[in-house]
Curated annotation (Swiss-Prot):
Catalysed transformations (reactions): tRNA(Asx) + L-aspartate + ATP = L-aspartyl-tRNA(Asx) + AMP + diphosphate
Coarse class of the protein's main subcellular location: cytoplasm
List of residues binding ATP: R218, D219, E220, Q227, E489, G541, L542, D543, R544
Residues holding L-aspartate: E172, R218, H455, R496
Function of the molecule: Aspartyl-tRNA synthetase with relaxed tRNA specificity since it is able to aspartylate not only its cognate tRNA(Asp) but also tRNA(Asn). Reaction proceeds in two steps: L-aspartate is first activated by ATP to form Asp-AMP and then transferred to the acceptor end of tRNA(Asp/Asn).
Region of interest (Aspartate), ranges: 196-199
Oligomeric and partner information: Homodimer.
Name of the molecule in the record: Aspartate--tRNA(Asp/Asn) ligase
Length: 605
């Protein structure tokens, strides 16, 4: 039905007959001559319909946007002055000899070149939305990335092995999606949050190097970078050290970027310990494009009269930091007020600041309502540690460490991505990858009064920290590593526990008793007793990687049929009710939703 794609018709085909198939992107009637921009996945070509072929011309008169067409004609050069340098086919046009309407279209609900559509409209009419050139580009980029990953891993001796989609519920992380079993009444499968345990058992089975590009499922509240079902590049290896694993997959990401986008990432990614990342940036996924970082002031603020600073400085788990913004004294009071409201989102009670007008004058060269509350030694230490220069502004965070890290880390990004930062060289438009390593093994859950795994409970502690599993879990450092790119964690992995006695100690540190561990993870504990090899791996979020490469606002723009932030598919209207017969077969009875009790009306005078 065609000899070429529309976007591949160029001047090299001048004088040749072509058969094209595609959609009417736009139809124009110019003085009795009809022009149709014919579109397919490769691009557009201009089709000219002259009235000297009456039968064909009559068909052209009835064509409307999104009609599916077949065109037969001759490639000719466009008249002088009518070429379009923005199109690959912009120097030629096709003189139509035969025009067939393969299928008409009702009037589309929107123009495909409308850039102001709501996401609801786009997802409801996803079939049409996917015809848009940007969406075609995004999904083809996704395909190219996946193919480059496969090529690289195949060349490195990895084997693509599928693991089950129906598995056992082990609710240690996000909520599982549960699937009721019809055959085993009252029992449930879970959709996998990752193939973690299966890939570890494949290592025990001797497969040595495994990968798959697979769907994973998590029933969690959604954000711009989350979906209930997402695609993971999942990898595991045996007999490689942590450094060897990182080197292997660092090269994979370099290869993917080079071969799909002609982007050369750093020859060697920098490596930063978790502790350093939190100290300098308040985040374990720092965006290194932003040239701002924290100045630690906790110890220097212990004896000041300003309780906003001295309180957290003397409290266990408190922190005081400054964020120096070079040239920031030019920010208006309105800018500062906006930043103050912004940090309140993250739990900060306010945002102290000092404008540095003239460093040499000390206290007298500073502009701020808080200067009067700080003694000279404290002011001198702030200026010295921060490296403040004339014309700078210093923002301060003082609270519990988590609040300071969250609020000031977010402020760093907010300021760093602003027009002000971009115009003053505080933001570098580049690809900035790094590894973050040496994560804490555990973090303490105050609500449940127990330790929880920072990554997952199958991550190995550093060899020298094994003793802390039973004496002081908070001191344990894990053999875990994240690959971070421009402030996004695109991959995370670890060296795994491969000895049963160590895995059991980790479960006990997590307050998972031997009986519960046996019930939930007995298959793993048994497998580890059969000469399990040292192994480790990593998983990359394909959706996130492609989102970054495409410059998209959301991962929904790189997934063909995504869910909304309410976990709904607006195209198919899923999820949806099912009939009573299906529920009976699954041994399920629905309870009526509990009515919400209305709040009592306020009394009126």
């Amino acid at each position: 039905m065609r000899t070429q794609y529309c976007g591949q018709v160029t001047e090299q085909l001048l004088g040749q007959s072509v058969t094209l198939s595609g959609w009417a992107h736009r139809r124009r009637d110019h003085g009795g001559v009809i022009f149709i921009d014919l579109r397919d996945r490769e691009g557009l070509v201009q089709v000219v319909c002259d009235p000297d072929r009456p039968e064909m011309f009559k068909v052209a008169e009835g064509v409307r946007n999104e009609f599916c067409l077949q065109v037969k004609g001759i490639v000719r050069a466009r008249p002088e002055g009518t070429t379009n340098p923005n199109l690959a086919s912009g120097k030629i046009e096709v003189l139509c000899h035969e025009l067939t309407v393969l299928n008409a279209s009702v009037t589309p609900p929107f123009q495909l070149d409308d850039d102001n559509l709501s996401e609801t409209t786009r997802l409801t009419h996803r079939v049409l939305d996917l015809r848009r050139p940007q969406m075609q580009y995004n999904l083809r980029l996704r395909y190219k990335v996946a193919m480059e990953v496969r090529k690289y891993l195949d060349d490195k001796g990895f084997i693509d092995i599928e693991t089950p989609m129906l598995t056992k519920s082990t609710p240690e992380g996000a909520r599982d999606y549960l699937v009721p079993s019809r055959v085993n009444a009252g029992q449930f499968f879970a959709l996998p949050q990752s193939p973690q345990l299966f890939k570890q058992m494949l290592m025990v089975s001797g497969f040595d190097r495994y990968y798959q590009i697979t769907k994973c499922f998590r029933d969690e509240d959604l954000r711009a970078d989350r979906q209930p079902e997402f695609t993971q590049i999942d990898c595991e290896t045996s007999f490689l050290s942590e450094q060897e694993i990182r080197d292997l997959f660092e090269e994979m990401i370099r290869t993917v970027f080079q071969n799909t986008m002609s982007v050369a990432l750093d020859a060697k990614f920098p490596v930063m310990e978790f502790r350093e990342a939190m100290a300098r940036f308040g985040s374990d996924k720092p965006d290194l494009r932003v040239k701002l970082e924290f100045t630690e002031l906790t110890d220097a603020m212990k004896d000041v009269d300003f309780k906003v600073f001295s309180g957290p400085a003397n409290a266990e788990g408190g922190r005081v930091v400054a964020l120096r913004v070079p040239g920031g004294a030019a920010l208006s009071r309105g800018d500062i007020d906006a930043y103050t409201k912004f940090v309140e989102i993250y739990g900060a009670k306010g945002l102290a600041w000092i404008k540095v007008n003239e460093v040499a004058k000390g206290r007298d060269g500073l502009q701020s309502p808080i200067v009067k509350n700080l003694h000279d030694a404290a002011i001198a230490e702030i200026l010295k540690r921060s490296g403040a220069q004339d014309g700078d502004i210093l923002f301060f965070g003082a609270d519990r460490a988590k609040v300071v890290n969250d609020a000031m880390g977010a402020l760093r990004l907010k300021v760093g991505h602003s027009d002000f930062a971009k115009s003053t060289g505080l933001f570098e438009d580049a690809w900035k990858p790094l590894w973050v390593v040496d994560f804490p093994m555990f973090e303490y859950d105050e609500e449940d009064a127990r330790w929880v795994a920072m990554h997952h409970p199958f991550t190995s502690p550093k060899d020298e920290h094994l003793e802390y599993l039973e004496t002081d879990p908070g001191k344990c450092i894990a053999k875990a590593y994240d690959m971070v790119l421009n402030g996004w964690e695109i991959g995370g992995g670890s060296v795994r526990i491969y000895r049963e006695e160590v895995q059991s100690k980790v479960f006990r540190a997590l307050k998972i008793g031997d009986e519960e561990a046996r019930a939930k993870f007995g298959f793993l504990l048994d497998a580890l007793q059969y000469g399990a090899p040292p192994h480790g791996g990593i998983a990359f979020g394909l959706d996130r990687v492609v989102t970054m490469m495409a410059g998209a606002d959301s991962i929904r723009d790189v997934i063909a049929f995504p869910k909304t932030q309410r976990a709904q598919d607006l195209l198919t209207q899923a999820p949806s009710p099912v009939d009573e017969k299906q529920l009976r077969e699954l041994h399920i009875r629905l309870r009526a939703a509990e009515a919400k009790v209305a709040a009592p009306a306020a009394a009126t005078a």
